[in-house]
């Protein structure tokens, strides 16, 4: 492989890349409506964008699909979150997203059970 250094990294004070975040179908198991989960994800979308943008400053060609699996406990708190799959290969982005998700608050599942969510984000600069 090469050294990876190139001219014109594209970082400029006046330029800001638009970041595209697209959604795929989440996998949800448990007694919480999909719409309730998606609402919380949408409300926190800027946190996901932040995780990506910070690393994009350092690596201009960074993009990929990051799939996170998390468990919502009986009170609506995220009790566990982990990387399920990633084509991005950026531990900094992946760990940042996991940390953000751990702080999210969902509605309490019906009957106090747990809900498992697997959610994929596709992140790329446009």
Residue ranges and their predicted role:
Residues 1-42, 126:
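Intrinsic-disorder/low-complexity signature in envelope-associated proteins
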Residues 18, 65-67, 116-118:
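Broad gene-expression machinery/nucleic-acid interaction feature
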Residues 22-24, 73, 84, 124:
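A structural detector for beta-sheet-dominated domains
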Residues 30-35, 39, 46, 53-62, ...:
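Short, positively biased Gly/Pro-containing turn/loop motifs at secondary-structure boundaries
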Residues 63-75:
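Short edge beta-strands and adjacent turn/loop segments
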Residues 68-70, 81, 119-121:
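Preference for bulky hydrophobic residues occupying beta-strand positions
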Residues 78-93:
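Short glycine/proline-centered loop/turn elements that form peptide/ligand docking sites
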């Amino acid at each position: 492989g090469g050294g990876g250094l190139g001219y014109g990294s594209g970082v400029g004070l006046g330029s800001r890349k638009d970041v595209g975040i697209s959604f795929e179908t989440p996998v949800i198991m448990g007694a919480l409506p999909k719409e309730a989960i998606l609402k919380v994800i949408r409300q926190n979308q800027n946190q996901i964008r932040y995780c990506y943008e910070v690393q994009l400053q350092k690596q201009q060609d960074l993009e990929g699909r990051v799939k996170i699996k998390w468990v919502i406990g009986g009170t609506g708190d995220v009790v566990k979150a982990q990387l399920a799959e990633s084509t991005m290969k950026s531990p900094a982005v992946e760990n940042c997203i996991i940390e953000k998700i751990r702080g999210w608050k969902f509605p309490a599942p019906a009957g106090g059970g747990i809900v498992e969510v697997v959610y994929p984000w596709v992140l790329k600069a446009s």
